[in-house]
Amino acid sequence: MDRLKYDIVVLGAGESGVGAALLAQAKGLHVFVSDYGKIAPKYKEELNRYAIPYEEGRHTEAIILEAKEIIKSPGIPDTAPIIRQAVAKEIGIVSEIEFAGRYTDAFMVCITGSNGKTTTTMWLYHTLCKAGLDVGLAGNVGFSLARQVAYDPHPYYVIELSSFQLDNMYDFRANVAILLNITPDHLDRYDHRFELYAEAKMRITRNQQPEDCFIYWEDDPFISRWVAEHPPVARLLPFAMEARTDNTTAWINEKNELVVMNLNSPFVMDEELLALSGMHNRHNAMATAIAAKAMDIKNEAIREALQDFKNVPHRLEKIARVKGVDYINDSKATNVNSTWYALESMKTRVILILGGTDKGNDYTDIENLVLSKVDGLIFLGIDNEKLHKFFDGKISRIADACSMHEAVSLAYKMASKGDTVLLSPACASFDLFQNYEDRGDQFRKEVLNL
């Protein structure tokens, strides 16, 4: 049985899990990787190349439950039987980010929130690179932090963090923590209790020191209340659409300029010059600018980066104009609030493609925008009953689709010249697609084939 005892067992063999295994091995730890599903060929080849033992299609309890510590991939819920058994045996369970943080003294800039995480992460990464910093991109984007710490270390990292990653972080410290917003999402993973999900997001301030910064959206009532009731140790640098208090660090003034104050020299920029439009992107730009200013990046570099950034794929990505109709891919909108921001930014009549795997959604939040802007709804999913129950009778044209080909064909028939066909599903993608990227890629392919 001794041969089955490992220092580290990694559950999940995606980028996060394989990166953790590589770092564990590099640090001289005896590591084993277990994936209940199929391991992608590129990761299997990598594990073989580094002679890291692994299994797929099962979780062997005799091995896993003898580990000194388990590194859990964020996609594995706490309700998984193997996790419950590990907890019962009091085996420590951490995230890949937590594990990687033990082996680096790099400056960590961490971004979380229900919406805007990827855009802000990429925008800030772009800004720091433009300023000449040697910076790594990690978390939900780029290569895993563990892989980079092992084989491509940087003095700075910009890290996108989900609530699932924050759940299993205990000693990790964010030098700059950014919380963009908190709206109901992934409630199926949090016993359908918003407060549990919100508490996970607030963990980003854990272990911060007085010299660190906490950047947050001051207009969010939950965040503001939480900050008042549980004052973080770090310096507070809030942003808002208007200057709410003397402490407000960034806002949009009456001249429609983005203003950053209270950080060495003031920063002012016409919001029309921002690379991305829409209210949500003003928030993302303010958070980016505050973080850059807090890191002593020069105004010129910040201004350039805010102006020439290219948005991430699958986030309000314009695919094509076909016979006077614009087709926009917002497949990354996996919750209702993301779809709200997408609809808010639309300047034309909309044919909206909604649906997928519901995560405890409340469609009341987008009802007014749908009623005022949407001329047709297409429900793309295996089970559209909840969508029909909410929207039937409110929008005259509603259709169901069980494939992206069918959804785009229906949208093409519904749309009139000057309209926008918007894929902004407000749901996860796992009923019909591998992930939101696959969903967006299929949308792009179907549109370009029209």
Curated annotation (Swiss-Prot):
Chief location bin: cytoplasm
UniProt-recorded Gene Ontology molecular function terms: ATP binding; UDP-N-acetylmuramoylalanine-D-glutamate ligase activity
One Pfam family linked to the record: Mur_ligase_M
Positions with a binding annotation for ATP: 113-119
The keyword Lipoprotein is assigned to this record: no
GO BP term, example: cell division
Biological function: Cell wall formation. Catalyzes the addition of glutamate to the nucleotide precursor UDP-N-acetylmuramoyl-L-alanine (UMA).
Similarity field: Belongs to the MurCDEF family.
Protein's name according to its UniProt entry: UDP-N-acetylmuramoylalanine--D-glutamate ligase
The species this protein was found in: Porphyromonas gingivalis (strain ATCC BAA-308 / W83)
Gene: murD
